[in-house]
Amino acid sequence: MVKTNTNKLTDDQISEIKESFDMFKSDNGKLDNDQIKYAFKALGCEITEETLELIKKKGQKSISFNSFFELVSPYIPKRDSMSTLEQAFKLFVKDGSGITFKDLKKVAINIGEECSDSDLYDMIEFADTDGDGVINKSEFISLMTTKKVL
């Protein structure tokens, strides 16, 4: 159970935090520093290097959901939904041109997600509405803001 005052957060925001944590956590059920960065970015937030250093100084190599929740919850009410989606898009692609198979595979490997190449291609095909083999920013935003089911 989360120990913080969640009055400022909606149920959807709390669910988002949990989903982000679950997406990036290791087999031990915790996030290491790299996974913390990815989970923050997926939520449209940036964690400072100072905060990561504080975690290290406390001797923590990884953090639990409750610790992650405590870290990220102050950032959530301040987010702009469009900038959140843009941050999430940037998780996948550095140059802004679009998410390719290679980008998607790299993120899957970085977060420890085992996906077959076929599954990754299916994901791209599902979101790629213009058929160019790349998920551009508008396709990504459309995917993330509509309730489609694979």
Curated annotation (Swiss-Prot):
Sequence ranges assigned to domain EF-hand in this UniProt record: 12-46, 80-114, 115-150
GO cellular component, one term: nuclear envelope
Pfam families: EF-hand_8 (PF13833)
Subcellular location(s) of the protein: Cytoplasm, Cytoskeleton, Microtubule organizing center, Centrosome
Binding site for Ca(2+): D128, D130, D132, E139
The keyword Transmembrane appears for this protein: no
Record keywords: Calcium, Cell cycle, Cell division, Cytoplasm, Cytoskeleton, Metal-binding, Mitosis, Repeat
A biological-process GO annotation: nucleus organization
GO molecular function annotations of the record: calcium ion binding
The protein's role, per its UniProt record: Plays a fundamental role in microtubule-organizing center structure and function.
Family: Belongs to the centrin family.
Identification of the protein by name: Centrin-B
Annotated organism of origin: Dictyostelium discoideum (Social amoeba)
Gene that this sequence comes from: cenB
